[in-house]
Design a protein with these regions (language model features):
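Structured, basic alpha/beta domains of bacterial-type, RNA-associated proteins
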Residues: 2-25, 29, 36, 40, ...
């Protein structure tokens, strides 16, 4: 590997250490229905989002709750020795994209057939820490003031 690629790979590795991401692929619900729950929890603190997902009756709520718990576990692995409550975790980004569609045929009157699209989706959830962002902004302000 060339030196330029090696440097870029090292920079990429360092940036991945500070990202806390969980992915859910091929979730068998329609993206539109999942986006309703994703929009409800976007930008909220982790504890508040868990409460909303736990008591919601929507089909995608338990899956998103499990995904959020997975992202929290990823944060815990990368930050051993830190307390989750002190870091003020929140949902920085949640993205629901369309996945693979299963196309089925449903019989219709007069010898016709209607196409049924069974949709799926992919969900990407990223956590952020309000404490880390506050310290980063104060450090950047200190550098600008000098």
């Amino acid at each position: 590997m060339g030196s330029r690629k090696h440097k870029c790979a090292e920079i990429y590795k360092e940036s991945r250490k500070s990202r806390y991401v969980a992915r859910l692929n091929n979730n068998p619900t329609s993206p539109r229905k999942t986006r309703l729950m994703a929009n409800a929890i976007r930008g909220l603190d982790v504890d508040k989002a868990l409460g909303i997902l736990q008591y919601s009756h929507r089909e995608s709520a338990p899956k998103l709750r499990k995904l959020l718990l997975s992202a929290m576990a990823n944060w815990q692995v990368k930050n051993t020795g830190k307390v989750m409550e002190e870091s003020e975790l929140y949902i920085k980004m949640i993205c629901v994209n369309g996945g693979r569609q299963l196309k089925r045929l449903r019989t219709a009157p007069q010898g016709r057939g209607y196409r049924v699209r069974k949709r799926s989706n992919h969900v990407i959830l990223e956590l952020g820490s309000r404490v880390e962002e506050r310290t980063a902004t104060t450090e950047s302000n200190d550098v600008e003031n000098k």
